[in-house]
Regions:
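Surface-exposed, low-hydrophobicity beta-strand/loop segments enriched in small/polar/acidic residues
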Residues: 2-115
């Protein structure tokens, strides 16, 4: 289990990005109010369908939709071999409560950009 460490991108010079090769189950931290982007680079030969699950996420109310069960986590769309997927973590903050686990991304490379 690897920890995906954010790379702070606020700089006047170049920034080296800390990439993590994903395993069966990886973790990362999220703090509401920060601007973080999760980037998954599918360097594998097949499609991946990652899932992000905060173990403290239960339900959330969304206007126009109602109460939504968050316990299964947030499943990303299929990421084809060679594609790069970027997710603004603020958009799924309700799923990011407690310990956050990323599964389904085996052998892909991931990093978090903090801007």
């Amino acid at each position: 289990m690897a920890v995906i460490t954010p790379t702070e991108t606020v700089s006047t010079t170049e920034v080296e990005i800390a990439r993590t090769t994903l395993g069966a189950s990886d973790t990362f931290a999220y703090t509401e109010g920060t601007t973080k982007y999760l980037v998954i680079d599918n360097v594998t030969a097949g499609s991946l369908t990652p899932n992000i699950d905060g173990d403290g996420a239960t339900t959330a109310y969304f206007p126009g939709v109602g109460v939504v069960d968050l316990t299964g986590g947030y499943t990303l769309g299929s990421i084809a071999a060679g594609e790069i997927f970027i997710l603004d973590l603020d958009h799924i903050k309700q799923y990011l409560q407690g310990t956050i686990t990323l599964t389904g991304g085996d052998a892909a490379e991931a990093y978090i950009l903090e801007v």
